[in-house]
Amino acid sequence: RRAHEDSIRTAYVKTVPDSAETAAFCQSHGLDFAAVRPLMAKACGNWQALEQTLCAYPEQKTIATLRTLSDKDLRDFSPAVLADHLTATPDAPAAFSAAARTLYYKYVSCPRIANELLTPWRSFFAKNISKKEAARFRAAPADMADKVRRLPIDTLWNPQGYCESPASAFTFGITDRKGKALLFVAMARSLGIPARIDEVTGKVQYL
């Protein structure tokens, strides 16, 4: 039985591109092998999704965004979800310093907020936040925080504490406290405002 299990595991591992295969892929698509190889190793069985994403969008932006994801996210992400985040997020301004670019990719372009299911919320907010309101929120993020804060809190329909998607919370106008935090950060990032949920305190923060 153990030998059979080992054979299944070995067969699976062999499906993941090795260093030589990754180098060939990078060469054929003009990609930086040194940047792609670690991502490919972490993606494991999700390597086809990774290759699809790398081929479809600008290299620097795509790799920088992929680097913000955890190893588990790289093994699980859907190309359709990443497509939403890559196409609906502007490139980091050329004048940004290296430190500013790191902050931008980590707290603006990153699809991951907390422990929620990764969902395609950027294009949703681009369509559902008016240009007038977007300009107001960019000028005064506290106004956006106040809008989210005023939403009714649901204490009845989610006893298991599942994470509601930001788009769903926005659509229905009611969510729990965690949902409010996710909603604010998603709205902020979709408007180019760096935001996060502090991992220690659980408080929402923006710059």
What is each stretch, according to the model?
Residues 1-153, 166-169, 179, 189-190, ...:
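N-terminal accessory/pre-domain segments preceding catalytic cores
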Residues 173-182, 187:
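A conserved hydrophobic secondary-structure block that centers on an alpha-helix together
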Residues 152-161:
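N-terminal export/assembly leaders
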Residues 156-157, 170-174:
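Conserved helix-adjacent loop modules within structured domains
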Residues 174, 193, 200-203:
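An acidic- and aromatic-residue-enriched active-site/binding cleft used to recognize and process polar
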